[in-house]
Amino acid sequence: MRKKSKEYNSNNKINSLIRLNKYISNSGICSRREADKFIEAGVVSVNGKVITEMGYKIQKTDIVKFNDSTIKSQQHKYLLLNKPKNYTSSFKDSFKKNSVMALVRNKCREEIFPIGKLDKKTTGLMLFSNDNDLTKKLTKKSLKIKCIYHATLNKNLQDIDLKKIKEKRWDDYGIKITDIAYANQKDKKEIGIEMIGPTKNVIDKIFETYNYQTTKIDRVYYAGLTKKNLARKESRFL
């Protein structure tokens, strides 16, 4: 019995190990790739010993220093917000009353940041996290993220223009429209548009190409996430 207990404790110790670059990334300082560069440069120490070995593993109780300052790893948080209209999404405006940061700042102890941005008039899904690796991944221009928007126009969208929008190549904007349809056949000002690629500010430009103006834009789907059961201005952890 004692032998089994010893093996169990040993396994627990192994399972509790974490890669040094991940620990640094979890602290919010940088991404894992950037952490590797700092480790290689010799500015990271563990329990007083400089570590330059790639793939080095530590225990969470170890003392890790970056440029002689102790850092602490933190748990990753992921928060989904249904952004209201007239709120800014820039982190630079985080202390303004109409900033999305004012809506999420007190949701957790960890400091979380918006992943991507929506312009002031656009409503809908926004993701917040302290996960640097995920943030860098989702904000890469080369990454093809699927989004669905509900747009309201200033006038009915003609069938011929809907077809043109769907068939046109939008390479200049770095996006691909995979589907577009009337959200309501009785009101052709209400449009659902599905696209892949970076989408900030492109909805306006798409419709302006055919002399339409958007009066409302709502992001209803983002990277596999929906706003089901999430009221405007409300948020929830994933």
Question: In which residue ranges do the predicted regions lie?
Answer:
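Basic, flexible Lys/Arg- and Gly-enriched helix-loop patches that mediate nucleic-acid binding at interfaces
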Residues: 2-238
